[in-house]
């Protein structure tokens, strides 16, 4: 019998001064995450911003927010731990926040 997946709101900030590295790693990060998105395990994701940028200016991304469907918080930590953004030093794993969540 499969364990029921629960929803979690996941917020993980970037380490300081990694915007250029984030941009270089974005394509492989998205490719690695695609199976989770396609399977419906990550129904929502996006970047947090230091501030809203004017049109034509570089977006000031400074982290990620997402909803992940998982069996446990430990499973989410393992997903984040294996992500290229964590491995290559974009995300600040020590500041990972995981909140039980219910979509409406």
Swiss-Prot record:
Pathway the protein acts in: Mycotoxin biosynthesis
Practical and industrial applications: Fusaric acid is phytotoxic to plants such as cotton and banana. It has been shown to induce programmed cell death in plants. In addition to a mild toxicity to animals, fusaric acid exhibits acanthamoebicidal, antioomycete, and antimycobacterial activities.
Induction remark: Expressed under high amounts of nitrogen via regulation by AREB. Moreover, components of the fungal-specific velvet complex VEL1 and LAE1 act also as positive regulators of expression. Finally, the pH regulator PACC acts as activator of FUB expression after the pH shift to alkaline ambient conditions.
InterPro entries named in the record: Dimeric_a/b-barrel, Sec-metab_biosynth-assoc, YCII
Organism domain of life: Eukaryota
Identification of the protein by name: Fusaric acid biosynthesis protein 2
Gene inactivation effect: Impairs the production of fusaric acid.
Coiled coil: none
PANTHER family listed in its UniProt record: PROTEIN YCII (PTHR33606:SF3)
Pfam families for the chain: YCII
Function noted in UniProt: Part of the gene cluster that mediates the biosynthesis of fusaric acid, a mycotoxin with low to moderate toxicity to animals and humans, but with high phytotoxic properties. L-aspartate is suggested as fusaric acid amino acid precursor that is activated and further processed to O-acetyl-L-homoserine by cluster enzymes aspartate kinase FUB3 and homoserine O-acetyltransferase FUB5, as well as enzymes of the primary metabolism.
Family assignment from sequence similarity: Belongs to the YciI family.
């Amino acid at each position: 019998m499969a364990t029921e997946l629960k929803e979690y709101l996941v917020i993980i900030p970037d380490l300081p001064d990694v915007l250029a590295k984030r941009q270089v790693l974005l394509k492989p990060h998205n490719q690695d995450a695609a199976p989770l998105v396609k399977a419906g395990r990550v129904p929502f994701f996006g970047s947090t911003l230091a501030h809203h940028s004017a049109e034509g200016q570089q977006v000031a991304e400074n982290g990620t927010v997402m909803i992940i469907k998982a069996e446990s918080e430990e499973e989410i930590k393992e997903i984040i731990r294996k992500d290229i953004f964590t491995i290559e030093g974009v995300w600040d794993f020590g500041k990972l926040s995981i909140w039980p969540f219910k979509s409406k």
